[in-house]
């Protein structure tokens, strides 16, 4: 099955690089997981403001999109710890298309080729104007800053541990977005991902909100935000809900921190986020709490947080706009008189899955990454992480407190 996926990835990439038909392209850089940017509309004739003009050809555009990320890693820990050793795999291989239409309409369809069966990641219809936007279909809900950032633009191989542990993901529903100056708010009503919409009677339902303020002061750009999530799991999560996270890698199935199966009926998540960029430097931090509500049992509360800082060794900067970090455009790319963009990042990553009589473990992670972006569509990442566990889900010779070291490299190409 893996061979079939690799063959599909290679064939698709070869077609898009060498044989794809001519398509319309936008000059505006767009983070891969952002909603679709619409082409500029023609300005009406000032002398006849009420006259209607035919839609221009630029109002209809179709753009293929794809990415491939390949990871190679080594995981070490105490003797006898499962999951250690050398690892390599395709992290992501996605192919999709963006369609922009007249009257502010747009659509996106994208698939992930590495899953079995192949899954849809984005599948939605969008309408927008200068301040408002409505999205219908499978999409990113109102998520933490680290998850809102495209996986093409994150600082490390994976996002913060709480993002995967608390189950932040794409879901099916309808959302509304409003922007006014430096302030924005968005909210949505959702159910499960498309692949799980097999029985309406057992589907979960949720309400999600996110707001942020992103002012500019002198030469520094700031971001302050908050988010809220309420979810009724219905029959979806009864006696099967687990909160757990992998060790700073997605290409391993081993998890050293995780709760037992819990009979969760509803859950709430609260989050705070902050970030700033000034020239070559950036900082970002988030804190999130998850409260799991159970029938006739104590309601545990779990916590996750991270803080990171980064600096470019070249004359580049990390864009912070629209409530997320955008793609890096090297000031002097390879082939354009330079070496591309080189960035160094440090992060502290904390996850606490202990609450009352529930012991899921604690993780304190210390991570460093070096990222080389020779051109906008290419990236090479190197990462080292030391993860310190206590009350770990997996014991080694009866010991549940130990450290794991993770060394990983990722090659990435996108279009």
Predicted regions and their residues:
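Outer membrane beta-barrel
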Residues: 51-234, 303-306, 311-336, 343-345, ...
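Short, intrinsically disordered low-complexity segments
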Residues: 1-3, 29, 40, 46, ...
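Domain-scale selection of a single, long terminal region
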Residues: 1-13, 204-210, 217-236, 261-293, ...
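Cleavable N-terminal export/targeting peptides
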Residues: 1-43
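General helical secondary-structure elements
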Residues: 1, 9, 21, 37, ...
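Acidic, proline-/serine-/threonine-rich low-complexity intrinsically disordered repeat tracts
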Residues: 45-51
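Outer-membrane beta-barrel pore domains
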Residues: 27-38, 57, 81-82, 239-415
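Intrinsic disorder/low-complexity detector
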Residues: 7, 29-30, 34-35, 47, ...
């Amino acid at each position: 099955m893996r061979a079939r996926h690799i063959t599909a990835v290679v064939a698709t990439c070869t077609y898009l690089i060498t044989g794809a038909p001519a398509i319309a392209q936008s000059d505006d850089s767009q983070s891969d997981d952002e909603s679709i940017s619409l082409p500029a509309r023609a300005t009406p004739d000032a002398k006849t403001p009420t006259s209607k003009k035919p839609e221009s050809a630029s109002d209809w555009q179709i753009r293929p999109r794809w990415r491939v990320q390949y990871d190679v890693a080594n995981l070490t820990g105490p003797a006898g710890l499962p999951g250690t050793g050398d690892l390599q795999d395709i992290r992501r291989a996605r192919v999709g298309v963006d369609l922009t239409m007249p009257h502010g309409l747009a659509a996106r369809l994208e698939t992930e080729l590495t899953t079995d069966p192949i899954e849809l990641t984005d599948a939605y219809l969008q309408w927008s104007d200068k301040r408002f936007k409505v999205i219908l279909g499978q999409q990113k809900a109102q998520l933490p800053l680290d998850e809102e950032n495209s996986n093409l633009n994150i600082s490390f191989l994976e996002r913060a541990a709480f993002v995967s542990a608390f189950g932040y993901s794409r879901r099916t529903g309808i959302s509304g977005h409003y922007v006014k100056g430096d302030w924005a708010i968005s909210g949505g009503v959702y159910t499960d991902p498309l692949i799980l919409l097999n029985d309406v009677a057992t589907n979960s339902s949720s309400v999600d909100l996110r707001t942020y303020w992103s002012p500019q002061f002198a030469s520094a750009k700031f971001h302050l935000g908050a988010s809220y999530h309420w979810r009724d799991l219905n029959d979806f999560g009864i006696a099967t809900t687990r909160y757990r996270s992998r060790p700073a890698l997605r290409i391993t199935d081993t998890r050293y921190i995780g709760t037992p199966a819990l009979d969760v009926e509803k859950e709430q998540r609260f989050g705070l986020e902050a970030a700033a960029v000034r020239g070559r430097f950036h900082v970002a931090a988030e804190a999130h709490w998850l409260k799991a509500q159970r029938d006739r049992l104590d309601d545990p509360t779990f916590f996750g947080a991270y803080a990171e800082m980064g600096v470019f060794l070249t004359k580049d900067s990390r864009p912070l706009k629209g409530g997320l970090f955008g793609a890096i455009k090297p000031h002097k790319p390879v082939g354009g008189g330079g070496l591309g963009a080189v960035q160094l990042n440090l992060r502290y990553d904390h996850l606490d899955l202990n609450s009352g009589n529930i012991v899921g473990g604690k993780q304190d992670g210390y991570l460093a990454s070096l990222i080389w972006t020779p051109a906008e569509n290419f990236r090479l990442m190197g990462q080292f992480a030391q993860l310190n566990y206590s009350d770990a889900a997996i014991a080694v010779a009866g010991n549940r407190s130990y450290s794991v070291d993770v060394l990983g490299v990722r090659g990435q190409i996108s279009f």
